[in-house]
């Protein structure tokens, strides 16, 4: 059966007209999801840089201006040392430590399984490169995991607080050691 056609095409007659009306609403969820693709993905596809999105209505928050970065550490001692340092340096407003995660990964041709501590770091998106550089400089792993995701929505007072706490670093324009 050719699933690329509307079901009414296979039936013919009056059923075609009836099913074509039923078929169109079925496409609406798919079409609406396509319209909600992040601007960054759409701009990457077109080759043009993403434009700054407008602030969320009434909150003054610019979607994506705060990021949640994730870093794995071999143990709680290392995670606490890095967490304290990034908060003291104002590279992050807050770091949550999530103990006893299990990571399964391939390393140098071998499947590994380790118990680790996951750090969830809230910072300004503009500070992610400096945060990454700092974590790489102090992390014991040969290849430290530092990944960040932009925060599109959240509690406006909290997101404002993240900006306030890290503002002096983001305005200085200097990279930290």
UniProtKB/Swiss-Prot annotation:
It holds the Pfam family CutA1. One of its GO terms (biological process) is protein localization. InterPro entries: Ion_tolerance_CutA, N-reg_PII-like_a/b, N-reg_PII/ATP_PRibTrfase_C. The keyword Signal applies. The keyword Signal applies. One of its GO terms (molecular function) is enzyme binding. Coiled coil: none annotated. Residues 1-32 form the signal peptide. Disulfide bonds: none annotated. GO terms for cellular component: membrane; mitochondrion. Keywords: Signal. Belongs to the CutA family. Homotrimer. This is Protein CutA.
């Amino acid at each position: 059966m050719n699933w690329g056609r509307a079901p009414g095409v296979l039936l013919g007659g009056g059923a075609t007209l009836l099913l074509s009306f039923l078929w169109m609403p079925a496409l609406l969820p798919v079409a609406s999801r396509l319209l909600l693709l992040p601007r960054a993905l759409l701009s990457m596809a077109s080759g043009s840089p993403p434009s700054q999105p407008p602030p969320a209505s009434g909150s003054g928050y610019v979607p994506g201006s705060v990021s949640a970065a994730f870093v794995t550490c071999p143990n709680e001692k290392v995670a606490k040392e890095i967490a304290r340092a990034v908060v003291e340096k104002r590279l992050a407003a807050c770091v949550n430590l999530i103990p006893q995660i299990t990571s399964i990964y391939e390393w140098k041709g071998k499947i590994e399984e380790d118990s680790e501590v996951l750090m969830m770091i809230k910072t300004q998106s503009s500070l992610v490169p400096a945060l990454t550089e700092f974590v790489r400089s102090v992390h014991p792993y040969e290849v430290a995991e530092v990944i960040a995701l932009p925060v599109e929505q959240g509690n406006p007072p909290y997101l404002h607080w993240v900006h306030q706490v890290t503002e002096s670093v983001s305005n200085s324009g200097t990279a930290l050691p």
